Amino acid sequence: MVTAEMVKELRERTGAGMMECKKALTEANGDMEKAIEILRERGLAAAAKKAGRIAAEGVVDAYIHGDGRIGVLVEINTETDFAAKNEDFRTFVKDIAMHIAASKPEYISRDEVPAERVEKEKEILRAQALNEGKPEKIVEKMVEGRLEKFYKEICLLEQPFIKDPDKTVQQLLNEKIAIIGENINIRRFVRFERGEGIQKKEENFAEEVMKQING
């Protein structure tokens, strides 16, 4: 059975349209990797088609919030130096750095989240569901659903893009790969926040970054 979540995942991984993704998954009997192959054969999977190509060029860029309270360093790679100088790519890098400043991701993708952290989160979510009086037979489904939300909060590629929340960072990345015509890889980032770890008044940094973007 092909679910909406499967269609969404395939779309995020390939950049193909919703209907094309649904057709490919149906044809592949729900096999994600086979569906990607089908889309590639049809020339519809721009991001997946380029994903295996080495991206060793690119840039390291920085974003400093206006008053110096937040700083981000990010490395994003392309296949060629020519693409790295592309204005659309440069704008993308700046946007990603701003997004990181505002949304505080901890990892690039869910593959980077340590297994022990995932297990600990599952234990917490399971305890929460049981404390809510939910029947044990549906607790595991609830845990899986809430775990997806957890990934969306801490993984950069799964977060709603700060400047256009209707798309994820992964979808934005897929769009740029299709436009620029090269593989693009968000390799690593580090986010600094002044006074981090020191008890202080809570600030809405996402709101402040958006004000600066729109200002």
Curated annotation (Swiss-Prot):
Please give the Gene3D superfamilies that the UniProt record associates with this protein.
Answer: 1.10.286.20, DNA helicase RuvA subunit, C-terminal domain, Elongation factor Ts, dimerisation domain
User: What InterPro entries does the entry give?
Assistant: EF-Ts_dimer_sf (IPR036402), Transl_elong_EFTs/EF1B (IPR001816), Transl_elong_EFTs/EF1B_dimer (IPR014039), Transl_elong_Ts_CS (IPR018101), UBA-like_sf (IPR009060)
Task: Specify the domain of life of the species encoding this protein.
Answer: Bacteria
Name its cellular compartments: Cytoplasm
The cellular component terms of Gene Ontology attached to this UniProt record, alphabetical and capped at eight, are: cytoplasm
Where are the stretches annotated Involved in Mg(2+) ion dislocation from EF-Tu? 80-83
Enumerate the GO terms in the molecular function aspect. Answer: translation elongation factor activity
Keywords linked to the UniProt accession:
Cytoplasm, Elongation factor, Protein biosynthesis
**Which Pfam family is an annotated match for this chain, by its short name?**
EF_TS
Q: Per the record's keyword annotation, is Protein biosynthesis included, yes or no?
A: yes
Function (record text): Associates with the EF-Tu.GDP complex and induces the exchange of GDP to GTP. It remains bound to the aminoacyl-tRNA.EF-Tu.GTP complex up to the GTP hydrolysis stage on the ribosome.
> What family does the entry list?
Belongs to the EF-Ts family.
What is the name attached to this protein's record? Answer: Elongation factor Ts
